[in-house]
Regions:
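Short amphipathic alpha-helical surface micro-motifs
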Residues: 13-14, 56-59, 99, 198-201
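Active-site-adjacent loops and short helices of periplasmic peptidoglycan-processing enzymes
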Residues: 20-164, 168-177
C-alpha cells in the first residue's frame, strides 16, 4: 500500500497520515488531500461555511509563532488569562506559573487550552490586534471563505471557515517547522513540569 498524508475536517476533528485504502469518511465537511503529491482525493461540502470551534486555534498558533521572536522567553500566567474560559478546555496552567511561550503553544495545540490562548494573546499583540492579524494571515494564505472573531473558537457568527480553507491553512502551517513539531507531538512536559497530552483524533500508520 502506498502511504499518503491527508487531512480531513469535520466540525470538530481532523486526522492525517493514513493509508488511502479502506478509510471511512463520515464527517459533514471534508477535504482529503495527498500532501505528498498535492492532490485532492475527496471532498464533501468543502466550500460550505461552518463554525470551526477549536480548529480556530491552528491559526492562533501560527500567528503566535510568526509574531514571537523568542519562544523560550518566560511569561507569567495572570488572572486575566482565565477570563472567558469557563466551559472551555484548559491546559492546566495556574496563576503565577512561569512558563515559556513554547510551553503555551503546546498548551494551545495539545489540550486545546483556552488559558494558553489568552496568555499568548495578552502577552503579544493584545486581543484586537491579534484577531486582525489572524484575518490578515488568512487572506495571505488564500482563505477567502474564512473569518476569525476570536482566538479561542467561541461560537460567533463571524468566526467561521470551510474545510477547503482549513486545508489551505494546515498545508501552509506545516511548512513551518515549529508549527509542524508542535502539531505532530502527542505528549509534552512544560518547563514547570505540567504534562500535556494531545486531544487530536489521529489515524496514523
Amino acid at each position: 500500500m502506498k502511504k499518503v498524508v491527508f487531512f480531513l475536517f469535520s466540525l470538530f476533528f481532523f486526522c492525517y497520515s493514513v493509508y488511502a485504502e479502506n478509510f471511512d469518511i463520515t464527517g459533514e465537511y471534508v477535504s482529503l488531500y495527498n500532501m505528498n503529491e498535492d492532490i485532492l482525493l475527496y471532498s464533501k461540502n468543502d466550500t460550505k461555511k461552518t463554525s470551526i470551534a477549536s480548529l480556530t486555534k491552528m491559526m492562533t498558533t501560527l500567528v503566535a509563532i510568526e509574531e514571537i521572536d523568542n519562544l523560550d522567553k518566560i511569561v507569567t500566567i495572570k488572572e486575566r488569562d482565565f477570563e472567558g474560559t469557563v466551559g472551555y478546555s484548559k491546559a492546566g496552567f495556574k496563576v503565577g506559573d512561569k512558563v515559556t511561550y513554547r510551553d503555551l503553544l503546546y498548551g494551545i495545540i495539545l489540550p486545546s487550552g483556552a488559558d494558553a490562548v489568552n496568555a499568548v494573546v495578552n502577552n503579544t499583540l493584545g486581543y484586537d490586534k491579534f484577531i486582525k492579524k489572524m484575518n490578515e494571515t488568512a487572506k495571505k494564505i488564500g482563505m477567502n471563505d474564512t473569518s476569525y472573531a476570536n482566538p479561542v473558537g467561541k461560537d460567533d457568527e463571524n468566526n467561521y471557515s470551510t474545510s477547503n480553507d482549513l486545508a489551505k491553512l494546515l498545508k501552509y502551517a506545516l511548512k513551518n517547522e515549529t508549527f509542524k513539531t508542535i502539531f505532530t507531538t502527542k505528549n509534552y512536559k512544560t518547563s514547570n513540569g505540567l504534562n500535556l497530552e494531545s486531544t487530536v483524533n489521529r489515524y496514523e500508520n
